[in-house]
């Protein structure tokens, strides 16, 4: 195949490489053939083990299941499916970019990566909305925050994510450049670039705006609650800390890569490119591994900051510690906050009604 008809897949993640001149078979980052295989192997081992333990602990935990646990299990399943493809990328990096595992795995692994990316973003958005409803609207949200609704939402997310990943199967192919096999993206057409831009906006930046908005509203509500109740020291700090850690992990993992992807698409749509191809490729190479690493960090975040999940994991691995007290001061289930805020909102409504009756 003519090299001009393809662009080598150098961005490490499901994305269109819009510039046909990005075809270098070497990396702009030194020692990637040594560092990335080691890094991806570590991500694979820790991520597979961590997500398996997390899913098993929450699935087999006796007693009632929290609503947010349904989203966490699905998020862990999405990450686990992606992590299964990492050995293929380890081999790719170790062989200096060559794809030696055939056309089927070239298309299949790219499709699984695409599904994971969309599924993760949508699940994180739903988790943010769930926290918003639980903390900001605890009374009104009772009719929506049900187990059956959560299962329907998760099933819908998987279905939509699988559909959004289908273009990958059509655009990915195993191609030969200088008689060497590469898992490549076909040359981008203007229509394909426009689709990529629209998809990126609605599958990342809009969910990102929703996540940030939800957590800003949560933070404001928590501040108002603790100021009214007079308890705004440790509880407030821990609640806000958990919120910002979740948001920060999401931003650090996804924002650099998708920003580089956005710049690459915009550059491909312009007649005169304002962003050099080498800079765009370097941005993809540096930010891609961060997006990969996101799939292994979530179990550790939940273990450290959610005592409910920490208790479930320890009980799953060491049943003998069943009666051990793990504390609940940093639990992210928001149950104690929901009850407190419900009382707080009822008190506010009662005060407003009383003032209105007095004024009349």
Swiss-Prot record:
The entry's localization annotation reads:
Cell membrane
One GO BP:
angiogenesis
SUPFAM superfamilies referenced in this protein's UniProt entry, alphabetically: Family A G protein-coupled receptor-like
**TM helices/strands, residue ranges:** 34-54, 70-90, 121-141, 150-170, 193-213, 240-260, 285-305
Q: Which GO terms describe its molecular function?
A: C-C chemokine binding; C-C chemokine receptor activity
**Predominant subcellular localization, coarse grouping:** membrane
Which parts of the chain does the record assign to the membrane side Extracellular? 1-33, 91-120, 171-192, 261-284
Q: Which residues lie on this side of the membrane: Cytoplasmic?
A: 55-69, 142-149, 214-239, 306-360
PROSITE patterns in the record: G_PROTEIN_RECEP_F1_1, G_PROTEIN_RECEP_F1_2
Tell me which domain of life the UniProt entry assigns to the organism this sequence originates from: Eukaryota
Describe the processing and modification events after translation. Answer: Phosphorylation is necessary for YWHAE binding and efficient surface expression. O-glycosylated. Sialylated O-glycans in the N-terminal tail inhibits binding of GPR15LG.
Question: What keyword terms does UniProt attach to this protein?
Answer: Cell membrane, G-protein coupled receptor, Membrane, Phosphoprotein, Receptor, Transducer, Transmembrane, Transmembrane helix
Question: Pfam families annotated for this entry?
Answer: 7tm_1 (PF00001)
Single GO cellular component term: external side of plasma membrane
Q: How does it sit in the membrane?
A: Multi-pass membrane protein
* Tagged with keyword Ligase: no
Modified positions (Phosphoserine) are 359
State its role: G protein-coupled receptor that plays an important role in immune homeostasis. Acts via its natural ligand GPR15LG, a chemokine-like polypeptide strongly expressed in gastrointestinal tissues. GPR15-GPR15LG signaling axis regulates intestinal homeostasis and inflammation through the migration of immune cells. Controls thereby the specific homing of T-cells, particularly FOXP3+ regulatory T-cells (Tregs), to the large intestine lamina propria. Also required for skin localization of thymus-derived dendritic epidermal T-cells.
Record family assignment: Belongs to the G-protein coupled receptor 1 family.
Q: Which PANTHER family match?
A: CELL ADHESION MOLECULE (PTHR10489), G PROTEIN-COUPLED RECEPTOR 25 (PTHR10489:SF954)
Quaternary structure? Interacts with adapter YWHAE; this interaction promotes ER-to-Golgi transport of GPR15.
Protein name according to UniProt: G-protein coupled receptor 15
Which species does this protein come from?
A: Macaca nemestrina (Pig-tailed macaque)
The encoding gene is: GPR15
């Amino acid at each position: 195949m003519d090299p001009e008809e393809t662009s080598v897949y150098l961005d490490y993640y499901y994305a269109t490489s819009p510039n046909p001149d990005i075809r270098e078979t070497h990396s702009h980052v030194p020692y990637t053939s040594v560092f990335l295989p080691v890094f991806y192997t570590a991500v694979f081992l820790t991520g597979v083990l961590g997500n398996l333990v997390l899913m098993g602990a929450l699935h087999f935990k006796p007693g009632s299941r929290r609503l947010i646990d349904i989203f966490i299990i699905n998020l862990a399943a999405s990450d686990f499916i992606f992590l299964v493809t990492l050995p293929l990328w380890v081999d790719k990096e170790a062989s200096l970019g060559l794809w030696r595992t055939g056309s089927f795995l070239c298309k299949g692994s790219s499709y699984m990566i695409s599904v994971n990316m969309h599924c993760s973003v949508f699940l994180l958005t739903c988790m943010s909305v769930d926290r918003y409803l639980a903390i900001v609207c605890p009374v009104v949200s009772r009719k929506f925050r049900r187990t059956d609704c959560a299962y329907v939402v998760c099933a819908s997310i998987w279905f939509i994510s699988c559909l959004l990943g289908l273009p990958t199967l059509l655009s990915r192919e195993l191609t030969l450049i200088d008689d060497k096999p590469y898992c490549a993206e076909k040359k981008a057409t203007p229509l394909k670039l426009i689709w990529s831009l629209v998809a990126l906006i609605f599958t990342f930046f809009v969910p990102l705006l929703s996540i940030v908005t939800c957590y800003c509203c949560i933070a404001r509500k928590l501040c108002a609650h603790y100021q009214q109740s007079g308890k705004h020291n440790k509880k407030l700090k821990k609640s806000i800390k958990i919120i910002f850690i979740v948001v920060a992990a999401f931003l650090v993992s996804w924002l650099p890569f998708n920003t580089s992807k956005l710049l690459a698409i915009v550059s491909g749509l312009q007649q005169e490119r304002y962003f050099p191809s080498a800079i765009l490729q370097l941005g993809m190479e540096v930010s891609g591994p961060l997006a990969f690493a996101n799939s292994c960090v979530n179990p550790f975040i939940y273990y450290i900051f959610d005592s409910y999940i920490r208790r479930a994991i320890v009980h799953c691995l060491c049943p003998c510690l069943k009666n051990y007290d793990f504390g609940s001061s940093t639990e992210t289930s928001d149950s104690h906050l929901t009850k407190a805020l419900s009382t707080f909102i009822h008190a506010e409504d009662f005060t407003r009604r009383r003032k209105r009756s007095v004024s009349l």
